[in-house]
């Protein structure tokens, strides 16, 4: 486990380049900062300044090396590296509320933007007019779209929203791709077709993720539940009410294992038993090292009561948390190995820090941890 603190400000979103030597982060404002690793240090090499509202989503296309950003100014920008400068291209999303999240499609020929306008904008490049255009997926979304993830086939798109639903839509754009082959989620996939809709839960859907095979989709809600739908089992949904505070982000690290994190400030593991169709809690992945405890003198106890409203030592803001992150984890991304067999993943948080987690090291450090 490696932790690096970039900022005093929260990191609201991040994205990595292809070879993982650079990371783009938003310091909770209208800018995007790109850091490059040199030895053990991270050095700021670029600042992307075009939005006039807070940046809410970043994604970095690995093959084309283009960055897409969206923000509360209701716009998206596609950034292209020319020489040593990132040049922005405005994408008109045709929305009247803030954009909330953005994701490149796997083939990098289009991207999706979720927004507070109760629509998903599917944007693609029109060669004839030399311009980015978008189509809207509207029905039956009834509230802000908070999270998006693409199916490996480049057509299906999972969306989590504030109307307590996880849905899968077809985002087939005939102008830029061939007709898709049938999937376990369905065979007919015209643009905007609703392929799956979860039954009502009791919370906003903060994060959504497809498995590497695309036959499973998982999501986390504000009521601290984790859900998984399996297309190979007639879209049966497994639900687990976790004991954590609400989770904000998740990712598959194998086809049967999920890592999620949120307001508890540390990642947790969930495993899926396909035979039983059940989710189970796999354990906390951030177990603190036990430090030697010594008794407090009466003087120290009264000082702590006066300064920190606590009689225990080390409970200043953030200092009392026995986790690497000292505030909510806002995003998780797979660093190496992919979703099928992840070997490293990354978390960024509202404490302005980034943690890199090694799966094998976690397995050896935690005796009861079993990643299937």
Curated annotation (Swiss-Prot):
It is found in: Cytoplasm, Cytoskeleton; Nucleus. SUPFAM superfamilies: WD40 repeat-like. GO terms for biological process: Arp2/3 complex-mediated actin nucleation; response to estradiol; response to estrogen. One of its GO terms (cellular component) is tubulobulbar complex. WD repeats lie at residues 6-45, 50-89, 94-135, 140-179, 242-280, 324-367. Changing residue 105 to V: In IMD71; uncertain significance. It comes from the Eukaryota. Component of the Arp2/3 complex, a multiprotein complex that mediates actin polymerization upon stimulation by nucleation-promoting factor (NPF). The Arp2/3 complex mediates the formation of branched actin networks in the cytoplasm, providing the force for cell motility. In addition to its role in the cytoplasmic cytoskeleton, the Arp2/3 complex also promotes actin polymerization in the nucleus, thereby regulating gene transcription and repair of damaged DNA. Belongs to the WD repeat ARPC1 family. Component of the Arp2/3 complex composed of ACTR2/ARP2, ACTR3/ARP3, ARPC1B/p41-ARC, ARPC2/p34-ARC, ARPC3/p21-ARC, ARPC4/p20-ARC and ARPC5/p16-ARC. This is Actin-related protein 2/3 complex subunit 1B. It comes from Homo sapiens.
């Amino acid at each position: 486990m490696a932790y690096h603190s970039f900022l005093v400000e929260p990191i609201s979103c991040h994205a990595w380049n292809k070879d993982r030597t650079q990371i783009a982060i938003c310091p909770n404002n209208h800018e995007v900062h790109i850091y490059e690793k040199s030895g053990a240090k991270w050095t700021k090499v670029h600042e992307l300044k075009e939005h006039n509202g807070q940046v809410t989503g970043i994604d970095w296309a690995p093959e084309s090396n283009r960055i897409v950003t969206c923000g509360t100014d209701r716009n998206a920008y596609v950034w292209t590296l020319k020489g040593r400068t990132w040049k922005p291209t405005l994408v008109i999303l045709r929305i009247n509320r803030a954009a909330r999240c953005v994701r490149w499609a796997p083939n990098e020929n289009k991207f999706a933007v979720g927004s507070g306008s109760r629509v998903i904008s599917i944007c693609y490049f029109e060669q004839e007019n030399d311009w980015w255009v978008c189509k809207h997926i509207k029905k039956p979304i009834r509230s802000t779209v908070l999270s998006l993830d693409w199916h490996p086939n480049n057509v299906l798109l999972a969306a989590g929203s504030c109307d307590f639903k996880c849905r899968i839509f077809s985002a087939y754009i005939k102008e830029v791709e061939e007709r898709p082959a049938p999937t376990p989620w369905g065979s007919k996939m015209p643009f905007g077709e609703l392929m799956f809709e979860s039954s009502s839960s009791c919370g906003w859907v903060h994060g959504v993720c497809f498995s590497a095979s695309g036959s499973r989709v998982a999501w986390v809600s504000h009521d601290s539940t984790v859900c998984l739908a399996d297309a190979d089992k007639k879209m049966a949904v497994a639900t687990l009410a976790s004991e954590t505070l609400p989770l904000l982000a998740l990712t598959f690290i194998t086809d049967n294992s999920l890592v999620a994190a949120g307001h508890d400030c540390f990642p947790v593991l969930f495993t899926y038993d396909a035979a039983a169709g059940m989710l189970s809690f796999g354990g906390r992945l951030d177990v603190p090292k036990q430090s030697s405890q010594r008794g407090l003198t009466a003087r120290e106890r009264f000082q702590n009561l006066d300064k920190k409203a606590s009689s225990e030592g080390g409970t200043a803001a953030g200092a009392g948390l026995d986790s690497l992150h000292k505030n909510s984890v806002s995003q998780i991304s797979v660093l190496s190995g992919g979703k099928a067999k992840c070997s490293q993943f990354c978390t960024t948080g509202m404490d302005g820090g980034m943690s890199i987690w090694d799966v094998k090291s976690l397995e050896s450090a935690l005796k009861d941890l079993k990643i299937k």
